[in-house]
Structure formats: structure tokens, C-alpha cells
């Protein structure tokens, strides 16, 4: 169990490093081939997204976040259940004038070896999400 725990911790640190650097490639480097991601709460109605979608969406999102900062407030790591939870706040400027200020928790699941992330469920600030993403979608459609 100790070696699996060490592998999970190393994987988690790599994932968080990519997150802090707003670097999707770095984050997804530790994602398994069958990786999935889902935005929570369920009431938002978002489907589970496969890795292939995250590989397109994350770089696009990070590309518009200027002066990005991520502050981690809490990390809980449960080796036995192959999970970690991260509570964080990120902030950034955007080219369309809507400030990015997202308070959220990420629930991360590791594979059996602990060297890959197989799933991330991200509980977002719904008030922010419901205001930001229509503005973001409008920006994307105007800047194709």
C-alpha cells in the first residue's frame, strides 16, 4: 500500500502542478487513456466528458486566462480508496473583460497502480459558472 500511496501522491502533485501552471498538457499527462471528467453539481446537467474532449476544451480555456493564479486551500488524500479531494480558488483576467474567479473542489480518482488519474469530478461555483460560461461561449463564437 505504501508504494501505491507514493505513486498516488506523485501523480497528484504532477496533476496539481499542471493545474497551477494552467497547463492542460501537463495536467493530462497523468490522465489514463480512459480518463473522464465531469462538472458538478449534477443539477447543471453536464455529461461525463472523455479525455479526448478534455484535450480540446482545457487548452482552449487556459489560453484565455491571463494572470492566472490557483490557491490550494485543502488537499485530502485517501490512499485506500484511491481518491483525493482538492479545494481551491483560481482567478484570472480574460480578454473579454469577465474576470475568472472560480471557487471549486476537484474529486480525483486514481488507477490501481496510482500512477494515473482516471476520473475528475469538479464541483464548481454555480453562480460564477452560470455567468461566466455564456460570456466565454460568446467570445469563442466571435473569435473563431
Swiss-Prot record:
Amino-acid biosynthesis found in the keyword field: no
Organism, as annotated: Pestalotiopsis fici (strain W106-1 / CGMCC3.15140)
Gene Ontology terms for molecular function: monooxygenase activity
Family annotation (PANTHER family): AUSTINOID BIOSYNTHESIS CLUSTERS PROTEIN F-RELATED (PTHR39598:SF1), AUSTINOL SYNTHESIS PROTEIN F-RELATED (PTHR39598)
Family per record: Belongs to the avfA family.
Enzyme class: oxidoreductase
Gene for this chain: ptaG
Classification via InterPro entries: Fungal_Meroterpenoid_Isomerase, NTF2-like_dom_sf
Induction: The cluster is expressed in rice fermentation medium. Three regulators are located in the cluster (ptaR1, ptaR2 and ptaR3), suggesting that the production of pestheic acid is controlled by a complex regulatory mechanism.
Pathway: Secondary metabolite biosynthesis
UniProt keywords, alphabetically: Monooxygenase, Oxidoreductase
EC number of this enzyme: 1.-.-.-
Protein name in the entry: Monooxygenase ptaG
Function text: Monooxygenase; part of the gene cluster that mediates the biosynthesis of pestheic acid, a diphenyl ether which is a biosynthetic precursor of the unique chloropupukeananes. The biosynthesis initiates from condensation of acetate and malonate units catalyzed by the non-reducing PKS ptaA. As the ptaA protein is TE/CLC domain-deficient, hydrolysis and Claisen cyclization of the polyketide could be catalyzed by ptaB containing a beta-lactamase domain.
Amino acid at each position: 500500500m505504501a508504494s501505491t500511496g507514493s505513486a498516488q501522491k506523485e501523480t497528484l502533485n504532477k496533476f496539481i502542478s499542471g493545474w497551477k501552471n494552467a497547463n492542460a498538457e501537463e495536467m493530462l499527462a497523468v490522465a489514463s487513456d480512459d480518463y473522464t471528467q465531469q462538472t458538478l453539481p449534477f443539477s447543471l446537467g453536464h455529461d461525463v466528458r472523455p479525455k479526448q474532449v478534455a484535450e480540446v476544451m482545457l487548452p482552449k480555456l487556459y489560453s484565455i486566462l491571463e494572470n492566472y493564479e490557483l490557491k490550494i486551500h485543502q488537499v485530502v488524500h485517501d490512499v485506500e480508496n484511491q481518491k483525493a479531494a482538492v479545494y481551491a480558488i483560481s482567478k484570472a483576467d480574460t480578454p473579454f473583460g469577465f474576470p475568472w474567479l472560480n471557487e471549486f473542489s476537484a474529486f480525483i480518482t486514481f488507477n490501481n497502480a496510482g500512477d494515473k488519474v482516471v476520473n475528475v469530478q469538479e464541483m464548481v461555483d454555480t453562480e460564477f459558472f452560470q455567468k461566466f460560461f455564456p460570456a466565454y461561449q460568446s467570445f469563442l463564437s466571435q473569435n473563431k
